[in-house]
Each structure stands twice: as C-alpha cells, then as structure tokens.
Regions:
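Non-catalytic cap/lid and distal C-terminal segments of serine-dependent acyl enzymes
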Residues: 20, 55, 83-87, 96, ...
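Short, low-complexity N-terminal intrinsically disordered segments enriched in polar/charged residues
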Residues: 1-53, 167
Length: 167
C-alpha cells in the first residue's frame, strides 16, 4: 500500500500572521489581495500582508512575459510570492489601483475557484482603466482560514476580449 506524505498545516505562510479579517471568507481574501497591491504613486505596499494571504509554496502566475504589457508575448511566469513582489515593486512607483468588477465563484467543501475580472488604473479617479483582465484564484480553507494556493491571470487584448459571462 502506498503511503502519502502529509505536510504540516502552517500557522502562516511566513512569519507574518494574517489579519483574521483578511482570511475569514472568500470575499475577504479576494478584497485583501486587491487592496494590498493598490495605492498612489510612491506608497509603499504592505508586502507582509501580501505574504500572509498565501499558502507556503503558493504560485502567482502572470501570463505576460513582460510586466505591465497587455497580452504580448504570452508565456506563463511561475513565481513565488517573493519573486512576484520583486517583479511588481518597480511598477508600483507610479500609481496603481486594481479593482474587481465581476466575480464567479465555485466552491466544493474547503476548496474554491474564483474567476475575478479586474480593471487597472494609475489613479483611483481615472475615468477609464488602462488594462482589464481575469484573475483565476485557487483557494483552500484549512478549517481556520482561507489561503491562496495560486493566482493565474491574463490581460484583455484585442485578440482576447473578456467574455460577457465574466463581466
């Protein structure tokens, strides 16, 4: 009989404890994810908060090989949380606000998949977004809190418009 190695359940994804309000529900963890990356030019992001949302070994996977480009040279980038922070931190020197505009959630037991359609702006007051796309979140609840296992996304482009069912 084959045995399966069980990994210990983490207290947090790093030494950074999550705010219980950020991880108490699917709505809360999705909102926290958008909140932590959004802010005005030059505002330092709370990367410890970001780290606390992710399960150890979680992946963040943009499909654009060059950060901030719309659907150019598509190639998944398999990043851990630290590599993601290093990739986006220079881009956040200008204002960046990402907001969810629609969501489809499917849940079975303690696992959930969330299709989260987003818009990105340089200023919260910008009339039109400079980018839109869809984030695919895979979540897990350990009985105490929700964790992000992965986020995978693609920006909208002329070749790949967001389908109506995701708006």
């Amino acid at each position: 009989m084959n045995s399966v190695e069980r990994l210990p359940m983490p207290e947090s994804s790093t030494s950074h404890s999550a705010d219980p309000r950020d991880v108490e529900s699917i709505d809360a963890i999705i909102a926290a994810t958008y909140d932590v990356i959004s802010g005005p030019a030059g505002q330092k992001r709370d990367w410890n908060r970001e780290r606390s949302l992710f399960y150890p070994g979680a992946r963040i996977m943009p499909t654009a090989s060059v950060p901030g480009r719309n659907d150019v040279d598509l190639e998944p980038q398999l990043l851990d949380v630290e590599a993601y922070i290093a990739r986006v931190e220079p881009l956040l020197q200008q204002g960046f606000y990402e907001t969810e505009i629609a969501r489809r959630t499917e849940q079975f037991g303690r696992i959930a998949h969330v299709w989260s359609t987003y818009e990105s702006r340089h200023e919260a007051s910008d009339a039109a977004p400079f980018m839109r796309g869809i984030n695919s979140f895979q979540l897990f609840n350990d009985g105490k809190r929700w964790w992000i296992l992965s986020i995978y996304w693609q920006h909208e482009s002329a070749d790949h418009e967001i389908p109506q069912k995701y708006l």
